[in-house]
Amino acid sequence: MNARGASAFVLAKVFRGQSLSSALPPYAADINKSEKARLMDLCYGSLRWFPQIECYLQALLKKPLRPKDLEIKALLISGIYQLLNSETPAYAVVHDSVSAAESLGRPWARSLVNACLLYT
């Protein structure tokens, strides 16, 4: 699993009420060292800017995501965070996020993720 997919799972657990300090270590242990820093940046940064990013995301979506799709919401939030606050090229963020949507087992969300991140 890459850092983007792992961050979606970690953030979804945090949105469900688990603390970041308990949700992050199991996923950080499963990825290589070069991706671990990226995972931590995506998780901490997304949560730091969560209120602003969530308002922005609500403006992009025609209707809210279902509660069972928290991983997709987390993927969108981490993608928007990275687009706004990192020097990673936008095309790379969009491509990684769309690929992660499919690897999360939600291929229907690829077009949603693509559209939301392209408008960011």
Segments from the language model and where they lie:
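An amphipathic alpha-helical micro-motif enriched in hydrophobic residues
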Residues: 42, 74-80, 113
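Conserved nucleotidyltransferase catalytic core and NTase-mimicking acidic/glycine-rich helix/loop elements
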Residues: 97
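N-terminal interaction/assembly modules
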Residues: 1-63, 80-81, 87
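A short alpha->loop->secondary-structure connector
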Residues: 104
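Σ70-family region 2.3-2.4 aromatic/basic alpha-helix that recognizes the −10 promoter
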Residues: 37-40, 108-115
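Short, flexible active-site-proximal loops enriched in glycine and acidic residues
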Residues: 66-73, 85-94, 107-112
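Conserved small/polar residues in nucleotide/adenosyl-binding loops
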Residues: 119-120
